[in-house]
Amino acid sequence: MKYVNFCLLAIISLVLSAVAVKKELPSTGYHPGETIPDIVLTNSEVTLQHLHDYKGKKVVVNFWAAYDAQSRAANVQLHNYLKMNHPEIEFLSISFDENRNVAEKTLAMDHLEHSAQFYEVNGTRSDLYKDFKLKRGFRNYLIDENGVIAAMNITATDLRAIFQVESSI
């Protein structure tokens, strides 16, 4: 009888613990190891480009807005670091400022080239903003040549470390 009670208790414990385990992780956008979706980019001349046009190259995609000091600083730092140290890596900066003039004046004050700057015309109301869950904070992504996210929320220091490891391999 002791063994029957013990077995029943063990079975009930297993069933309850199996039911209590979450099957899905909470999602906050796209993560390293996942393929980044195609993003339609609009530049200052309102010309459309696609992120997939850059396949075969390493790309840093940076989401930012002039009203967010942290994302604006990251935009300047990443742009300058890549321009000076890794010009072969594409830098795509996507602004979510609802007023494009604000973004353009911010770029001028920050002395950034317009060639790698893009605008999300619907700002924070856009599907892109929602898909990447940017309400929780602006992010940036390092994308490899195959369109796979290699790292996210990177700094110039992180890039330096990543590229040092890659060059030593």
Predicted feature descriptions by range:
Residues 1-27, 169:
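Bacterial Sec-dependent N-terminal signal peptides
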Residues 22-51, 164, 168:
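N-terminal "domain-start" segment that seeds a small globular fold
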Residues 50-72:
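Short active-site neighborhood of thiol/selenol oxidoreductases, capturing the structured segment around
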Residues 60-61, 91, 140:
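Hydrophobic beta-strand anchors of alpha/beta hydrolase catalytic cores
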Residues 72-110, 124-129:
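Structural microenvironment flanking redox-active thiols in thiol-disulfide oxidoreductases
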Residues 108-145:
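Short, internal strand/loop/helix patches
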Residues 136-169:
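Thiol-/selenol-based redox modules, centered on thioredoxin-like
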